[in-house]
Amino acid sequence: MAVSDLLNRRVRALPDEDEELYSEASVSELESNDEEVEGSGSDISDDSSEGDYSSDSQDESDAMSHENEEEDDEDDENSDDGQDDVQASLSNISFGALAKAQASLGPTAKRKSKATQSKTDDGETPAASPLDDIRARIREAREQKREGSSKSKDLEKFSRSSKHAPMVQSSKHPVTRKRTIIEPPAALKSRDPRFDPAVRSQSGRSEASQSAYAFLDDYRAAELKEMKEKLAKTKDPRQKEALKRDIRSATDRLRTIENRRREKEVLAEHKKREKELIREGKKSTPYFLKKSELKKQALLKKYESMGSRQRVKALERRQKKLTAKERKEMPMERRGLGNDPTPYNDGGGGKRRRLA
């Protein structure tokens, strides 16, 4: 019974870090307990060697067992007191001391690597898991990406050869992430119909635009009248020349507009006449006017609408214009009068003829 009690005795291992925290009394008690245990063990061995199973030895063993139980209770109480002392001492340690201790031990990754190295040194081969392989590949890919980005950044750093040289800039710009899903309405712009190409151009002057901007002709006529009145009142020669030039351009513009309107009227009458002839069966195909014939008919209509005196003046001006045009096309020898050797006796300029 005594041997089994000794083997079944509870023994607690104390931490190595807290050896200095134990008191001398506890150490002396532990030594005395060890000596008593050794003494009891020697007595038991002597009894077993002698082989005396007397009642006296049994009484002694029973007494020893009771003493051992009491010693175990005392050990438990001493261990509880030691743990309380450890907790109190840990609560009094400063954070600086803890930080120094952690720094001396090193980071967790290094400690783990050291632990794995010690295991490999001991001969234990760690089992390679697929997760570790995947993590290693991801780590390598990240490192390669970082190296490539650092190289590209180094290449993108441009520098000028001198301060007078133009700055070198990359033509690669990132595409904007913004998208125009709904186009905003265009801002209304004020426009002047006098300078609008849709109004001024011949192709854009449809019937709708003519009827919509018919009031511009009245404005142009009133503007021309005002310029003529200013020309009669002004005495400055520069202003007179400028007004004459403006009046000439305004009259030409009005004349052109009137001629176009007259040509359209002539063309509309001709189309109407041709349709009637086709409807009556006198013609199978319509006849389309040429530009020269259209101009002649428009000119005849213009002269018909004039008075007698206006018609005479217009015919005289037209005759002078045609003679000047023919004279320019005439050779130099035929321009003179009689046997006058001067080639410019008529006072008009013209083309010179090269001598062969």
Swiss-Prot record:
Residues in coiled coil: 238-280
Pfam families reported for this sequence: RRP36
UniProt key word Coiled coil: yes
Chain intervals with Basic and acidic residues compositional bias: 132-159, 313-337
Gene Ontology CC: one annotated term: 90S preribosome
GO BP field: maturation of SSU-rRNA from tricistronic rRNA transcript (SSU-rRNA, 5.8S rRNA, LSU-rRNA)
Cysteines engaged in disulfide bonds, as pairs: none
InterPro entries in UniProt: RRP36 (IPR009292)
Top-rank taxon: Eukaryota
Main location per the UniProt record: nucleus
Disordered: annotated segments: 14-209, 305-356
Record keyword rRNA processing present: yes
Bias type Polar residues, positions: 200-209
Keyword terms: Coiled coil, Nucleus, Ribonucleoprotein, Ribosome biogenesis, rRNA processing
Subcellular location: Nucleus, Nucleolus
Start-end of Acidic residues biased regions: 31-50, 57-84
Subunit note: Associates with 90S and pre-40S pre-ribosomal particles.
Family as reported in the entry's similarity comment: Belongs to the RRP36 family.
Function in brief: Component of the 90S pre-ribosome involved in the maturation of rRNAs. Required for early cleavages of the pre-RNAs in the 40S ribosomal subunit maturation pathway.
Protein name (database record): rRNA biogenesis protein rrp36
